[in-house]
A protein has these predicted regions:
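N-terminal auxiliary segments of SAM/dcSAM-dependent transferases
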Residues: 1-29
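Class I SAM-dependent transferase core
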Residues: 21-65
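Mobile active-site "lid"/loop adjacent to the S-adenosyl-L-methionine
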Residues: 146-178
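Class I S-adenosylmethionine-dependent transferase superfamily signal
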Residues: 85, 176-182
Length: 182
């Protein structure tokens, strides 16, 4: 029995995707990692990296909404949830919302590398601000893995990207230099 027949929905990873950046590699301090099928993801070597939370979020979303064609990912970070889900939902379009400059930049590069520019609208901003989404935008599927620890509920990293991915902070109320309570 072939592997493809044994595991329903599994597809053998293919060649490097035809994205506009598929000829480039990671910058200094970054890695380019396999994420789903033939998709690759740019990540900082010592920054926030995709995790099983992202894999499970994408899996649950696409399992319970397998016909989604227009989806939203809130607190999207480096784009891992949306890219895993987009691989499982060929043809779906995605709006992602992320507050951090660095994470948005990595997500945009990953989308371009994977040839997803036409399927992804990567927005930078706070998803709690109504203006980030259009008044009449509708989505079949909404995923999210926003920060879930209040400040003081765990060890706070020295890395700014990691702090904002794990703790409920913003730039409005200080917790640590440059970071504030939500």
């Amino acid at each position: 029995m072939r592997v493809e027949e044994q595991f329903k929905g599994w597809t053998k990873p293919g060649p490097v995707p035809p994205g506009s950046l598929s000829h480039t590699g990671p910058a200094q301090g970054e890695t380019l990692d396999a994420i789903s099928g033939h998709y690759r993801l740019f990540q900082r070597s010592n920054g926030h990296r995709f995790s099983t939370d992202d894999v499970l979020t994408a899996w649950y979303g696409t399992t319970w909404c397998p016909s989604a064609s227009h989806a939203l990912d809130l607190g999207s970070g480096i784009g891992s949830v949306a890219m895993i889900a987009a691989w499982r939902l060929p043809g779906s379009t995605w709006v992602t919302v992320e507050a951090q400059d660095e994470s948005v930049s990595l997500a945009r590069r990953s989308a371009a590398y994977n040839g997803l520019e036409k399927r992804f609208d990567i927005r930078q901003g706070d998803f709690r601000e109504a203006a980030i989404l259009g008044e009449h935008e509708l989505f079949d599927l909404i995923t999210g893995s926003p920060p879930y620890f209040p400040p003081g509920e765990g060890v706070m990293s020295e890395d700014p990207q990691k702090i904002a991915c794990r703790f409920e902070i913003s730039k409005k109320r200080p917790v640590r230099e440059g970071f504030e309570l939500v």
